[in-house]
Amino acid sequence: MHEAQIRVAIVGAGGRMGRQLIQAALHMEGIQPGAALEREGSSLLGSDAGELAGVGKMGVIVQSDLALVKDDFDVLVDFTRPEGTLAHLAFCRKHGKSMVIGTTGFDEAGKQAIRDAAQEIAIVFAANFSVGVNVMLKLLEKTAKVMGDYSDIEIIEAHHRHKVDAPSGTALAMGETIAHALNKDLQDCAVYSREGHTGERVPGTIGFATVRAGDIIGEHTAMFADIGERVEITHKASSRMTFANGALRSALWLKTKKNGLFDMRDVLGLDVL
């Protein structure tokens, strides 16, 4: 049984997502925590990852150097910042390690680096690893094809005060899903802010609104508004554990993949629906 397990390295082990990932890894069948990493200079270096996550000693010591744990993991799970993730990507590409990437806020060059690396290693890259969010994206695709051409489309998202990028990666994924269903490019139809005398709403655009407040884990709504009616599709996360479980489910799914770039729709088989 042990030989069949996937060993995961968790980057950002001391962060909110990192601790959830450690907890989830201990309870998910087929997953073995292999390594835990934090940035150089962190006060958490040398700590036991299990104690850090509040689950007791597990014998995995928090390190800062991937090279020291190269032989301890099969899949690296990364929910950090773009600059750090790209450095980890280069390491994994060099050493043939698969990756699950939940980091958001990449520019186009960063996204291209991920696409390039996926020619050699297997990567699941998703804006959101919640099963519910990815089901929502499928619903948005279907709704956009039916209502999108004659409704006003708005995306509203809310997150905690510590989130540093806006709109959220999930909100952008929602916009891209809707735009693609309407044979549009999101860059050509997105409206990210409104202030002052804006004039009437431009038909065919997709608006975005962002809230940053308190400890909101994540709330996303897409509104399709027509005269006399509107459809709203909403997802609300109440625990980060849903993202952690989805990420580790992705790591298990990568077991049979040699290379390629995938997302949660692939992991969940949503494209066949």
From Swiss-Prot:
Catalytic activity reported: (S)-2,3,4,5-tetrahydrodipicolinate + NAD(+) + H2O = (2S,4S)-4-hydroxy-2,3,4,5-tetrahydrodipicolinate + NADH + H(+); (S)-2,3,4,5-tetrahydrodipicolinate + NADP(+) + H2O = (2S,4S)-4-hydroxy-2,3,4,5-tetrahydrodipicolinate + NADPH + H(+)
Active-site residue list: H159 (proton donor/acceptor), K163 (proton donor)
Residues the entry annotates as binding NADP(+): R39
Residues binding NAD(+): G12, A13, G14, G15, R16, M17, E38, G102, T103, T104, A126, A127, N128, F129
HAMAP family on file: DapB
Role description: Catalyzes the conversion of 4-hydroxy-tetrahydrodipicolinate (HTPA) to tetrahydrodipicolinate.
Protein name: 4-hydroxy-tetrahydrodipicolinate reductase
Organism in which the protein naturally occurs: Salmonella arizonae (strain ATCC BAA-731 / CDC346-86 / RSK2980)
Lineage of the species this protein comes from: Bacteria, Pseudomonadati, Pseudomonadota, Gammaproteobacteria, Enterobacterales
